[in-house]
Curated annotation (Swiss-Prot):
InterPro entries: Class_I_gatase-like, CobQ/CobB/MinD/ParA_Nub-bd_dom, CobQ_GATase1, CobQ_N, CobQ_synth, GATase_3, P-loop_NTPase. It comes from Rhizobium etli (strain CIAT 652). Keywords: Cobalamin biosynthesis, Glutamine amidotransferase. The active site is at C333 (nucleophile), H430. This is Cobyric acid synthase.
Length: 484
């Protein structure tokens, strides 16, 4: 059986995902067969695993860090929040059903078996499995039936390292408080802790380390600074949208309206990484900037609900004005569906609204259907005759006159639509901006020249940098026990 360690946090967004990715790369660089695992993830940023089916994009990134094929078993339970129907539940890559919060709590005990079975599959043939928890084990109101943190750790017998985020303040109280409220059996699973996102002179925290050990008895396995490479990794969660830069003075301004159920917004990361692009995320209450040359409508977990919110924010009027000025629009997946004349949902898959008018910027209509398209795809852009690689995760079929001008040929089949004036483009293909040739041609069409970086190589280099920084700042004795 493989060795395993689980990183749990004192809260959400403490940096567990990046630490797991960095440790996976560090172990892989030392020649180990290492695999990531997350029992339960809640995110609308999904990927298509190499063995088919959906997993969180964070686990897809961690598999990339581990230099191992991704699998649905690396994230056996994925919760995708949507509208009034609660969350869609994905189990081992396939749609299991839908449930609201309290109903899901009742489902968790029966999902534990699937989680443990997937963990066994991931561990089979591996030297090391690095597990990521969700939220915090201190949420003791959710401990009964837990599958994400201590419920999994105790059942699988995996020791836990607790991660505290010092940047947000109160890290000593967070760690000591977690120790205080955990049950004895759960507390015994914790072997030590890591301080993450430290700024400044580490020696200034020496007294803090002594205080934490005095209250908890836990050793410190390292004080990790802000990792410079982390900013070059794909965005994982909508929480990070609050921190993404607005502005920067790039020659080309691209605006992205942030809708409540935004999905797969890491599609935008390759554009955000370009130094001559100013990518701005627009929140509710803000106007779409009049000087934006391109507006991108990203994916959505609930097209109809997000379309209503788009109108409530006044962004439909902003979009119409943008197009009248000659501005361009790209809609991806749910964003593509919004650009059409009508969205039909006769089975109520997204809720109670069975039909809603779209923005009518493309002469197409979408009908939602229960069959879900989930696959990795290869394509060629018809606009720029450039190769594309990406993935599809969507419900529904889109048809109409503008589909006669497909935006791409995907897996040998026409996909998407282009308006007659060429200003509006829609596609179901996620990940198109990560295709360097396509991104280069797109930016050239706005007058930007120059050589573009290889986006996938830049992510890979960032993972190596993070692994190097962890090797520098984590306790060498602890690391030796983990990765040899």
């Amino acid at each position: 059986m493989a060795r395993a360690i689980m990183l749990q946090g004192t809260g959400s967004d403490v940096g567990k995902t990046v630490l797991v990715a960095g440790l996976c790369r560090l172990a892989a660089n030392r020649g180990l067969t290492v695999r990531p695992f997350k029992p339960q993830n809640m995110s609308n940023n999904a990927a298509v695993a190499d063995d088919g089916g959906e997993i969180g994009r964070a686990q897809w990134l961690q598999s990339l860090a581990a230099r191992t094929p991704s699998s649905v078993h690396m994230n056996p339970v994925l919760l995708k929040p949507q509208s009034e129907n609660g969350s869609q539940i994905i189990v081992q890559g396939r749609v299991f059903g839908q449930a609201k919060g309290r109903d899901y709590q009742r489902l968790k005990p029966q999902l534990l078996g699937a989680v443990l079975a997937s963990f066994e599959k991931v561990a089979d043939g591996a030297d090391l499995v690095i597990v990521e928890g969700a939220g915090s084990p201190a949420e003791i109101n959710l401990r009964a039936g837990d599958i994400a943190n201590m419920g999994f750790a105790t059942q699988a017998g995996v020791p836990v390292v607790l991660v505290g985020d010092i940047d947000r303040g109160g890290v000593i109280a967070s760690l000591v408080g977690t120790h205080a409220i955990l049950a004895d059996a759960d507390r015994a699973m914790i072997s030590g802790y890591i301080i993450n996102k430290f700024r400044g002179d580490v020696s200034l925290f020496d007294n803090g380390i002594r205080a934490i050990e005095g209250f908890t008895g836990w050793p410190c396995f390292g004080v990790v600074p802000w990792l410079s490479g982390a900013a070059r990794l794909p965005a994982e969660d909508s929480v990070v949208l609050e921190r993404l830069a607005k502005g920067g003075g790039g020659a080309l301004k691209i605006a992205v309206p942030v809708l409540p159920r935004i999905a797969n917004f890491d599609d935008l990361d390759p554009l955000r990484a370009e130094p001559d692009v100013e990518l701005v995320f627009i929140r509710s209450g803000e106007r779409l900037p009049a000087d934006a040359s391109l507006v991108v409508l990203p994916g959505s977990k609930s097209t109809i609900s997000d379309l209503a919110d788009l109108r409530a924010a006044g962004w439909d009027r902003d979009l119409f004005a943008h197009v009248r000025r000659g501005g361009r629009v790209i809609g991806i997946c749910g964003g593509y569906q919004m650009l059409g004349r009508t969205v039909h949902d006769p089975l109520g898959l997204e809720g109670g609204t069975l039909e809603t008018p779209g923005l009518a910027l493309l002469d197409v209509e979408t009908e939602m259907a229960p069959e879900k398209t989930v696959r990795n795809s290869h394509a060629r852009s018809t606009e720029y005759d450039a190769p594309l690689a990406g993935y599809q995760i969507h419900l529904g079929m889109t048809r109409g006159p503008d589909c006669g001008r497909p935006s791409a040929i995907v897996d040998g089949v026409p996909d998407g639509a282009l308006s007659a004036n060429g200003l509006i483009m829609g596609t179901y293909l996620h990940g198109l901006f990560a295709s360097d040739a396509y991104r280069t041609r797109l930016l050239q069409s706005f007058g930007l020249s120059g050589e573009r970086r290889n986006y996938r190589e830049s992510v890979d280099k960032a993972l190596d940098e993070i692994a190097g920084e962890l090797e520098r700042y984590l306790d060498p004795r602890w690391l030796a026990g983990l990765v040899g």
